[in-house]
Structure formats: structure tokens, C-alpha cells
A protein has these predicted regions:
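N-terminal beta-alpha supersecondary unit
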Residues: 5-75, 81-85, 114
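Short Gly/Thr/Asp-enriched flexible loops that form oxyanion-binding sites at enzyme active sites
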Residues: 81-106, 124-125
Length: 156
């Protein structure tokens, strides 16, 4: 049987933006982001407000990503989601949705480290992606205190 390709739904909910992207093999078909502007009035992200907004945004964002990609959820081959680091309540919304949908569709679920994704996303472009040569050194900044350990693990 010939390989027909792989559709992946990627879900991001680590802080205050709810995002979903659909990829076909190495091409990004859609990328939909719902911003949470409510935090501007507080001078920073309020975790409780962020998780509540994710609950409101996750279904419309994923529906929009699938529609923009021109596929149905039944065509998905796998679901990837942010497992951390990030705000616990926000992460729980994304991970719970991803786990439920993957179970309902009986497709694989892939947990993704947020900081690894920041680093590796630079290798994706509209024409596909060029694989990095491992090991490599990367530097990233985050408010998380344990990020240094995670980056070292990726680069080994």
C-alpha cells in the first residue's frame, strides 16, 4: 500500500494564546491563533483568565484550522499538543482536548515540549523544512526557570 501522507493537528495552549495548525507531511496548511487581549489591562497574563479563555477558544480555533486546511477531523493521522512548560490551567485545557479527540478518533497523540518547539519551529518554512544536524546549540528565553535543563536535554 502506498503512503498517502500524514495530516497532523497541532494544538498550543501554554500561556495566553490558543493556537491550532494543520500540517500535511512537511507543509503547514493552516495556522489559527486566538489572542487574549484581556490581559493587557492587568499588565501581564492572569492564569485563571487565560485558562477560561482557552476553554472558550479551543473548539472554534481547531474548527477554523481544519476548515482552512480543507480537511475534516476524520482525515487526521495524529494530534500533537503542548505538554509544557507553561501555565498549568492553560496546558490542561489543551492537553485534555487533544487527549479526548485522539481517543475519539483512535489516532496517535504526541506530547511536545514548548521550548523544543520554539527551537525546532525555525526549521519549518513554506517549502518544507530542512532537518537540523544534531547535536546543535540553541539559545532561547522564557520566564520558566527550568528551561535551561530542557534545552540541554534537546541538544544532547
Amino acid at each position: 500500500m502506498q503512503n498517502q501522507g500524514v495530516f497532523i493537528l497541532a494544538i498550543e495552549s501554554s500561556c495566553d494564546d490558543t493556537a491550532a495548525a494543520v500540517l500535511y507531511n512537511d507543509k503547514v496548511l493552516s495556522n489559527v491563533v486566538a489572542n487574549q487581549l484581556i490581559h493587557n489591562q492587568y499588565g501581564g497574563v492572569v492564569p485563571e483568565l487565560a485558562s477560561r479563555a482557552h476553554q472558550q477558544n479551543i473548539v472554534p480555533v481547531i474548527d477554523a484550522a481544519l476548515k482552512k486546511a480543507g480537511i475534516t477531523k476524520e482525515q487526521l493521522s495524529a494530534i500533537a499538543f503542548t505538554q509544557g512548560p507553561g501555565l498549568m490551567g492553560s496546558l490542561l485545557v489543551g492537553s485534555s482536548f487533544a487527549k479526548s479527540l485522539s481517543t475519539a478518533l483512535n489516532i496517535p497523540l504526541v506530547a511536545v515540549n514548548h521550548m523544543h518547539a520554539h527551537i525546532l519551529a525555525h526549521f519549518i518554512d513554506e517549502e518544507g523544512y530542512e532537518k537540523p544536524e544534531f547535536p546543535f546549540l540553541a539559545l532561547t528565553r522564557s520566564e520558566e526557570r527550568r528551561v535551561g535543563k530542557e534545552c540541554l536535554r534537546l541538544c544532547r
